A protein has these predicted regions:
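Hydrophobic alpha-helical transmembrane segments of multi-pass integral membrane proteins
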Residues: 1-438
Length: 438
């Protein structure tokens, strides 16, 4: 990473609280899952399932993405972050809104508290989007990565707007269709528009960098951008206005866009100069492999296959879980220990490099905890998905407990890095000087 990029980095007090809040949210999410096994036997529009979804989407995934973007945006775009004050305000609003919305959904309070939570979250999204767009405007050489990142925040604001309208519609019905109709729109533009586009934009820059690869041909990324956005725009227009029901076609466009991104990563991996992958990168490729399940299921749930209603409801649940607990969570679990240790190391040891013997970023966390975290996570995920599909609460509970173990190991490792202190640094030549005096 260049010196210019390091100098563009924002204050650690903007970035690190996002990681702390996200780690706690992941533990809360998995513990709530333990107490929600009874909610997986029916429709996905259930207070406990809505709670789990929003803790996963907001407190866990969006929170850590906000913090990561503040740190990585200067890396990807090679400019300074537009405003740290906007970032701090967005963090305060996102964290407060997430807590209030979680309480509201768990108890299904559809009144004032839920309204306030939705408004706080929407304002947080607008502030974050403003920060990203204004930062991107400073770019001298615009690339496809900037297209992905700027477009993703547009979809984030759109997702938040639909969410606000739905929240107020609970108490003051004014939308022409039922809640489930808009929930599908809200969920899909959030998952594919916000999460997927941002992951592709950042991943197309960072994953080759971690692999020590420098692919110059990014035509597949351009195809990815237009296919994903084209499918989303057509889906939203059809869902709201046209009602042709060609959802499988739009899904195929988005999936084709994902395939183009994966092809780009395949090229990068082939060019990579790093022969051995660490646990973080292995987990990242596990996350990409986990994409296969929701890709298959999106066609199963959109095509009229005449499946029994109980099975179809279970497949809808597995589809959603495979995205948030599967792909997104696995990616975060893998990338956290590629990014967070470097951020803490940079702010702790930047002034000592070259003069003192300093630890490496990988020395700041426990590889043993990370290894057991990954094992507990994968076994727990398989148990959770199998239990939902088979409608077996005991298997769901086993999966939830293992995921809770993984979340505690993850949080412990995160706070080990966050609480790292500089101590007992020895200058270069110290050992030789010490031997010379003996």
């Amino acid at each position: 990473m260049s010196a210019a990029t390091v100098s563009n980095s924002p204050s650690k007090w903007l970035v690190l609280p996002h990681y702390a809040f996200a780690a706690v949210s992941f533990v809360v999410l998995c513990l709530l899952l333990v107490f929600s096994t009874d909610a997986f036997g029916g429709h996905y529009f259930h207070p406990k399932l809505l709670t789990l979804t929003h803790v996963a989407a907001l407190g866990w995934a969006t929170m850590i993405i906000f913090g990561s973007v503040y740190q990585l945006l200067p890396v990807v775009l090679e400019v300074r972050l537009y405003s740290e004050k906007l970032g701090t305000a967005a963090f305060a609003l996102l964290s407060t809104g997430t807590v209030l919305l979680t309480i509201s959904f768990w108890n299904f309070w559809v009144g004032t508290i839920m309204h306030i939570a939705a408004c706080l979250l929407f304002i947080a999204f607008v502030l974050f989007a403003t920060n990203v767009v204004q930062t991107a405007r400073q770019v001298k050489k615009w690339g496809i990565e900037a297209d992905f990142m700027v477009t993703s925040v547009v979809w984030l604001v759109a997702t938040g707007l639909v969410g606000v309208l739905m929240v107020f519609n609970f108490q003051y019905p004014f939308l022409p269709q039922d809640h489930v109709h808009y929930l599908k729109l809200h969920a899909h533009i959030g998952m594919a528009g916000w999460f997927l586009l941002l992951i592709v934009g950042v991943g197309s820059k960072l994953i080759p960098m971690f692999l020590l690869a420098h692919p110059e041909d990014n035509r597949s990324l351009h195809w990815s951008y237009y296919l994903i956005n084209g499918g989303l725009v057509l889906f939203a227009a059809d869902h709201l206005f046209l009602h042709t029901g060609l959802y499988a076609l739009y899904a195929a466009m988005v999936v084709s866009g994902i395939a183009c991104f994966l092809y780009f990563l395949k090229q990068a991996k082939g060019m990579g100069k790093r022969p051995d992958l660490d646990l973080g990168m292995k987990q990242t490729f596990v996350a990409l492999t986990l994409l296969i399940l929701p890709i298959v299921l999106v066609f199963v749930v959109t095509l009229q296959l005449g499946l029994p209603q109980r099975l179809l409801s279970a497949l809808y649940l597995v589809y959603g879980l495979s995205i948030f607990f599967g792909f997104v969570s696995a990616l975060i679990l893998g990338q956290t220990f590629k990014t967070l240790p470097f951020i803490v190391w940079m702010h702790s040891y930047e002034d000592y490099v070259g003069r003192f013997k300093t630890p490496m970023p990988k020395d700041l966390y426990s590889v043993t905890l990370l290894r057991w975290q990954n094992i507990a996570y994968l076994v727990g995920l398989v148990g959770l998905l199998a239990g939902v599909l088979l409608a077996e609460q005991n298997i769901i509970l086993l999966g939830a407990v293992l995921l809770s173990v993984a979340s505690v190991l993850y949080a412990g490792n995160v706070f080990k890095v966050l609480l790292h202190k500089v101590k007992d640094l020895k200058p270069f030549g110290y050992e030789k000087a010490a031997k010379g005096t003996n």
